[in-house]
């Protein structure tokens, strides 16, 4: 799923993110940013997916949540800033 359209890696990124969040160790911040980036992008794509039209608002909220988590870790993250600007 190189384009992330099917979200095949989504459950794995969610599991790793939950594990790293539970550790509450800044050493894992770069891995958390990687997880949040994938998940934010997945939900960003899901906003426009006609098959998921009913969940568009929820997907938008989830995407914003993940991009915002990235900015909480790295306030200068340009990708997260661009994604949030594009969503709003």
Residue ranges and their predicted role:
Residues 17-31:
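Flexible helix-coil transition and linker loops at the boundaries of alpha-helical arrays
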Residues 20-23, 67, 74:
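Alpha-helical junction/boundary sensor with strong preference for TPR arrays
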Residues 32, 76-77:
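Residue-level recognition of tetratricopeptide repeat
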Residues 32, 38-41, 63, 84:
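Structural register within alpha-helical repeat arrays
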Residues 36, 43-44, 50, 54, ...:
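Residue at a conserved register position within TPR or TPR-like alpha-solenoid repeats
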